[in-house]
């Protein structure tokens, strides 16, 4: 199972590209021309941080279609496809959101939802899910994904990622400037950032980026509990979602691209970077829910 959600990696790549462009345009030299300009740096960090997260959100749906080789169900060609579309429509109406696009992808049991807006989203299920679960269990999984959309989880995770990106960009450059100043103490001939600044910033971007990913993953796990409860509410009972989770716990875990893993029904097994709580914790939370 891949350990870090696709959204985080897509976001990191976008931020990295923005950082390279900013360096080529001389932003780093501007920020350190007369000492470190913290106000300008904060503005730069906000643009970089939220810019990367928002771009990642906006491209999440086309990226999901491309990376999963999704078969879109525009006009159902079989009773199963008609049932899937009908189930998504039923839950979307119940949740008060626009009808999502619906797709099927090849793979082990899994499903995901994505999209930048509640009324322009996507719900997809795998062939493995359809083959290994009862219709009631698949219905519960679809309800879970629709709940993600209705709860605005993609936007919420984007805002959290944006805050963490801003923290990483700002702090890495403050520390990088301090390291560079220490290494070049007594050298009055050089101006602008030196090699110490660039090396420190790159290393800290990576290290702090992983620390930020842990925080983002924690928030993602909390959203999973809400989506499970949302599925139970949409179905009017919690047993189908509990049955679906129990069955998922006994099946091979289907991998999703990192960009949509956070909005899937199952996620990575790593503790700190896991985007989903352990199956047994999710079942217990549903059992204890009123």
Swiss-Prot record:
Cellular component GO terms held in the UniProt record: plasma membrane
Cell compartments where the protein resides: Cell inner membrane
Residues the record marks as active site: 145
Keyword annotations: Cell inner membrane, Cell membrane, Hydrolase, Membrane, Metal-binding, Metalloprotease, Protease, Transmembrane, Transmembrane helix, Zinc
UniProt xrefs under InterPro entries: HtpX_protease, Pept_M48_protease_HtpX, Peptidase_M48
Keyword Phosphoprotein: no
Cofactor: Zn(2+)
Membrane-traversing stretches: 4-24, 39-59, 159-179, 199-219
E.C. designation(s): 3.4.24.-
Pfam family, one: Peptidase_M48
Topology in the lipid bilayer: Multi-pass membrane protein
Family recorded in the similarity comment: Belongs to the peptidase M48B family.
Name by which UniProt lists this protein: Protease HtpX homolog
UniProt source species: Variovorax paradoxus (strain S110)
């Amino acid at each position: 199972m891949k350990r870090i959600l696709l959204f985080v990696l897509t976001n990191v790549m976008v931020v990295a590209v923005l950082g390279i462009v900013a360096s080529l345009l001389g932003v780093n030299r501007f920020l350190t021309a007369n000492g470190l300009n913290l106000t300008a740096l904060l503005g730069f960090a906000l643009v970089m941080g939220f810019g990367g997260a928002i771009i990642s959100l906006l491209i999440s749906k086309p990226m999901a279609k491309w990376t999963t080789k999704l078969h879109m169900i525009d006009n159902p060609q079989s009773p199963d496809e008609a049932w899937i579309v009908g189930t998504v429509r039923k839950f979307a109406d119940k949740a008060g959101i626009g009808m999502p696009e619906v797709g099927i992808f090849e793979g082990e049991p899994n499903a995901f939802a994505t999209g930048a807006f509640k009324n322009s989203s996507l719900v997809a299920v795998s062939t493995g899910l359809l083959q290994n679960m009862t219709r009631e269990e698949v219905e519960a999984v679809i309800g879970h994904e629709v709940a993600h959309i209705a709860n605005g989880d993609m936007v919420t995770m984007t805002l959290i990622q944006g805050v963490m990106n801003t923290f990483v960009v700002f702090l890495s450059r403050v520390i990088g400037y301090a390291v560079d100043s220490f290494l070049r103490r007594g050298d009055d001939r050089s101006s602008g950032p030196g090699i110490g600044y660039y090396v420190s910033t790159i290393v800290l971007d990576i290290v702090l980026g992983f620390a930020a990913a842990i925080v983002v993953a924690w928030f993602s796990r909390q959203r999973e509990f809400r989506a499970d409860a949302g599925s139970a509410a949409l179905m009017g009972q919690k047993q189908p979602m509990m049955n679906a989770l129990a069955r998922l716990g006994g099946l091979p875990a289907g991998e999703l691209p990192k960009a949509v893993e956070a909005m899937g029904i199952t996620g990575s097994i790593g503790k700190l970077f896991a985007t989903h709580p352990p199956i047994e914790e999710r079942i217990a939370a549903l059992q204890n829910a009123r």
